[in-house]
Amino acid sequence: MRPAALLLCLTLLHCAGAGFPEDSEPISISHGNYTKQYPVFVGHKPGRNTTQRHRLDIQMIMIMNRTLYVAARDHIYTVDIDTSHTEEIYCSKKLTWKSRQADVDTCRMKGKHKDECHNFIKVLLKKNDDTLFVCGTNAFNPSCRNYRVDTLETFGDEFSGMARCPYDAKHANIALFADGKLYSATVTDFLAIDAVIYRSLGDSPTLRTVKHDSKWLKEPYFVQAVDYGDYIYFFFREIAVEYNTMGKVVFPRVAQVCKNDMGGSQRVLEKQWTSFLKARLNCSVPGDSHFYFNILQAVTDVIRINGRDVVLATFSTPYNSIPGSAVCAYDMLDIANVFTGRFKEQKSPDSTWTPVPDERVPKPRPGCCAGSSSLEKYATSNEFPDDTLNFIKTHPLMDEAVPSIINRPWFLRTMVRYRLTKIAVDNAAGPYQNHTVVFLGSEKGIILKFLARIGSSGFLNGSLFLEEMNVYNPEKCSYDGVEDKRIMGMQLDRASGSLYVAFSTCVIKVPLGRCERHGKCKKTCIASRDPYCGWVRESGSCAHLSPLSRLTFEQDIERGNTDGLGDCHNSFVALNGHASSLYPSTTTSDSASRDGYESRGGMLDWNDLLEAPGSTDPLGAVSSHNHQDKKGVIRESYLKSNDQLVPVTLLAIAVILAFVMGAVFSGIIVYCVCDHRRKDVAVVQRKEKELTHSRRGSMSSVTKLSGLFGDTQSKDPKPEAILTPLMHNGKLATPSNTAKMLIKADQHHLDLTALPTPESTPTLQQKRKPNRGSREWERNQNIINACTKDMPPMGSPVIPTDLPLRASPSHIPSVVVLPITQQGYQHEYVDQPKMSEVVAQMALEDQAATLEYKTIKEHLSSKSPNHGVNLVENLDSLPPKVPQREASLGPPGTSLSQTGLSKRLEMQHSSSYGLEYKRSYPTNSLTRSHQTTTLKRNNTNSSNSSHLSRNQSFGRGDNPPPAPQRVDSIQVHSSQPSGQAVTVSRQPSLNAYNSLTRSGLKRTPSLKPDVPPKPSFAPLSTSMKPNDACT
């Protein structure tokens, strides 16, 4: 089954490949190293310095009266064509026509470059035997003149060249003199918007196409105009109006106008063509879906081939498509028959174009010339009825396309990187003038030479690719290092056997045949099948055959049969000091190439070299260097150049290998990328897992262990003894599990630099409902602070004794005591006391605080009975401005009750007893530590405890907050009617881990940010009896 499927695929591929014709190979190839010996014209006169050159900008060339006219920028050169092929070409005369300075200034004012503001000769025609008609752009102000042919002197007045010559040299134009009238096609405005087919001069009225009507002309590019019969035919390409829905589709067209057209009536088509019709040219490869060549490049004049009048045209693919060119032949009778067929119309702007029925076509038929045999009663076109004129105005397009001869291209060239743009035809080639040879010029400076074959039907049936020539001479034609290889025009002179090829910077004279290359080798001369070459018996060499030559010669154009002819060994002929030979008998010794050479009559084919084993690469043997064989004879290689094709098999193998290697490399790259991503994902997952485990044991707050509940000394201190988090896994510690949570720091070896700071602690909304035990402690502490008189020195190691610290389930101590060097600890920390000792110490402190409170009360009562009232009044008149902080002890999303925080109500005062308040912001924690430690050690049960002071939290600045602060207050009611409420503040502490070894007292890290909130005074919520105040 598989072999059958493979055979079917091969058959389909063969059929598909046979659908499109393959390019033929030339019999002979002439490279630039050989053609550089041809004469070149660069604008010099005989005897002038050839090193100095000026830019020519050649626009066109024309042969008239055995003289070659070269139309360039600001000049027209004349060259004598009756010279040999070995002589240099010089101009015999030079006509200079430069633009006036006023026109140049106007051109520059219009925004054009100075190189564009010249007079480019675009129209050069023979008006009659004595007059030369010339038109130029004249710095974007086209003008025309008449010159005498013999002297090139101007005569008559200069007149406007509008509608006869374009404004810009880049715009295409055509012009033709017929019966003394000038038929031109170009643009009529500066912006090249209005395209026109125009008739002027002569005794007939001036006519033009309808202005700005896309049905008549839509962005045309004019190529050629020919005079045939009663009509003038214009060949051009334009945007197809019938295919507007498909975008800008370009079609080749041919249009006709009658020579005797006098225009329409005063009502319809006045001073406009009444015979203008246009049709599409069809040049396509037939098949189920035709492959069209729509870009018309060049058209010949009407030539007669085998008794028929035809025109040959070159077409190409669009410039944004794959390169390809074709040559199609059209019979003039077929063109005339299309204009007698059906018309095409569009009934509405959105509808498609459809044929017009014959019954709707008015009489007389539009497009016919007045005064013809079918329209004898209409002497001129002015007499046509309005129906005919209106119909021709709205229906200029024909429905059918002009078919090419044999309904397919006569020649194809698709496997090259250039397009064919020019054409020249010799329809009387050979000594008997019975052959047709076509020369095609490309945009790369390459000339292709073909022989038209006549089939059994008596007409063109194909072509024979005779020769390929690279005629551009970079040494002489390049200007300022720029090589412009576009061929601007070609003119063939059969009498001199020359083809003049014009580039923008030079003109090269190329012989029609290279017969001297064959020398004395008869086999190669016959095998070349060139109508211009033949084997001359008298001289025993291959020579050029002029028309009607009387020399005895041998040719075989049809078959090129070389049977019975001997091989050509070491035969060469010298030309201009260079020896040449087509057959490399001594330089290529392989048998394969030799057999191929002999089978074609001595013509070398590069396929033989490719198939020959052990042969050298022909692509590398294209250099222009001559080489010398063993016998001293200089040979030259004429193999294909680097821009030729490679074998299909090699190309297929290269494509397959490239595909396989690309697939392998792509797989490797994809595997590496996937593996790298997989590793990255694994690393990220492992890091997230480790981070999750580390977060489970993260600390919400860390505090020092030593000196927490009373005893600041330890018998056996150990370093780095600190408390573990008081909040474990987001829950507050309770008395039942407090002992479990207090762990030695030496078991963890925590890094002190990693301890949390107030800035890095997330904030949560704090609940406002306080705990009852914490509220009582705050109230008692507030009373003690309010009743103090003096403050101890800043450096005193006395610490105030708080009211009894209650071990409530939600209570967190606000201060911890750390060992200091002044007490002899030598930077060591004490062990954590046991839970029972902590409870006992708390009880002792409670009793001491109660006794101290009673002592202060009695002391105040003995001094002033109304002291408490005054104190309350002072307190109410000047409440302390202490900021309220809000913080959290857990992760984001959780909230803690206010009772779970360590709170303290502080009152700040001055040395005057309870009358003024002053905020105190210690500059560092060491000062506060010394002060509080000393107060606690020395003044626990004495009356001096009235001087106890509550300082601000650690880590604050030296200055108080500038904005008013909100305070949490309680009310103190007096027994007097005028008693005032005392508002006291509760201030949390902020602690920074700056220097643990130097501080004797360390507060727990504050859980509230240091930002000044808005001021707020809470209402009185807790009442105190009068006897609770200081009396």
From Swiss-Prot:
Glycans are attached at residues 33, 49, 65, 282, 434, 461. SMART domains: Sema. Residues 24-512 form the Sema domain. InterPro entries: Plexin_repeat, Semap_dom, Semap_dom_sf, Semaphorin, WD40/YVTN_repeat-like_dom_sf. Changing residue 212 to N: Strongly reduced affinity for PLXNA2. It comes from the Eukaryota. CDD domains: Sema_6A. Particularly high levels in spinal cord, cerebellum, metencephalon, superior and inferior colliculus, diencephalon, olfactory bulb and eye. Disulfide bonds join 107-117, 135-144, 258-369, 283-328, 477-506, 515-533, 521-568, 525-542. The keyword Glycoprotein applies. GO terms for molecular function: identical protein binding; semaphorin receptor binding; transmembrane signaling receptor activity. It is found in: Cell membrane. PROSITE patterns: SEMA. One of its GO terms (biological process) is semaphorin-plexin signaling pathway. Belongs to the semaphorin family. Active as a homodimer or oligomer. The SEMA6A homodimer interacts with a PLXNA2 homodimer, giving rise to a heterotetramer. Interacts with EVL. This is Semaphorin-6A.
